[in-house]
Curated annotation (Swiss-Prot):
PANTHER family: DEOXYURIDINE 5'-TRIPHOSPHATE NUCLEOTIDOHYDROLASE
Keywords attached to this entry: Hydrolase, Magnesium, Metal-binding, Nucleotide metabolism
Species of the source: Oryza sativa subsp. japonica
Cross-referenced Gene3D superfamilies: 2.70.40.10
Signal peptide: none
Gene (UniProt): DUT
Lineage: Eukaryota, Viridiplantae, Streptophyta, Embryophyta, Tracheophyta
Record text on cofactor binding: Binds 1 Mg(2+) per trimer.
Name assigned to this protein: Deoxyuridine 5'-triphosphate nucleotidohydrolase
Length: 171
C-alpha cells in the first residue's frame, strides 16, 4: 500500500478537483421547421415574445366580439404544418386571463391537420370582449407526443395511490 510522505498526492488530487473542467460538447440539434401558410392579408405569423418563450403568439385575423359569459371562435387565417412527433397545444395568454377573464378551449392541433386554425375564446367576465385583427389571443406551444399502442388487459399494476382521485392526495 502506497502512502504519500509529503502530502504531494493529496495536493495533486486537490489540484485535479479544482481544475477547470471543459463543458461536455453539445450536439447541435436541428430544430424542425414550423411551416405556416397565411390564408389572408389579415393573418399574422406566429411569433415568440422572447428568446426563451415556450409559446408562439397567435393573433386574430378578424373583428370578433366574445359575449359576456359566452364564447366565440376567432379565426387566425393560418394553416400550420405541425412537425411530426409533436402536436400544438393552444393555451391562454396569461395577461388576457388575468385582466379580462378570457380563456381558451379545445386547444389541440394535430400534426396531420392542414385546415385553418381557429381559437375558441371563453369570456368569464360580465362584459363583452372585443377582438380586433392583429390582437394576440392565445399561445401555441409545440409539445412532443407519445402515442403508445392500446392493449386491453384484465388487471392493471397496483400502485400506492390506487383508485384515489379528485383531491385524494390533498387539496
Amino acid at each position: 500500500m502506497a502512502t504519500a510522505t509529503n502530502g504531494n498526492a493529496s495536493a495533486a488530487a486537490a489540484a485535479a478537483d479544482s481544475a477547470v473542467q471543459e463543458p461536455p460538447h453539445k450536439i447541435a440539434k436541428v430544430a424542425p421547421l414550423l411551416k405556416v401558410k397565411k390564408l389572408s392579408e389579415n393573418a399574422v405569423l406566429p411569433s415568440r415574445g422572447s428568446a426563451l418563450a415556450a409559446g408562439y403568439d397567435l393573433s386574430s385575423a378578424a373583428e370578433v366580439v366574445v359575449p359576456a359569459r359566452g364564447k366565440a371562435m376567432v379565426p387566425t387565417d393560418l394553416s400550420i404544418a405541425i412537425p411530426e412527433g409533436t402536436y400544438a397545444r393552444v393555451a391562454p395568454r396569461s395577461g388576457l386571463a388575468l385582466k379580462h377573464s378570457i380563456d381558451v378551449g379545445a386547444g389541440v392541433i394535430d400534426a396531420d391537420y392542414r385546415g385553418p386554425v381557429g381559437v375558441i375564446l371563453f369570456n368569464h367576465s360580465d362584459t363583452d370582449f372585443a377582438v380586433k385583427p392583429g390582437d394576440r389571443i392565445a399561445q401555441m406551444i409545440i409539445e412532443v407526443i407519445v402515442t403508445p399502442e392500446v392493449a386491453e388487459v384484465e388487471d392493471l399494476d397496483a400502485t400506492v395511490r390506487g383508485e384515489g382521485g379528485f383531491g385524494s392526495t390533498g387539496v
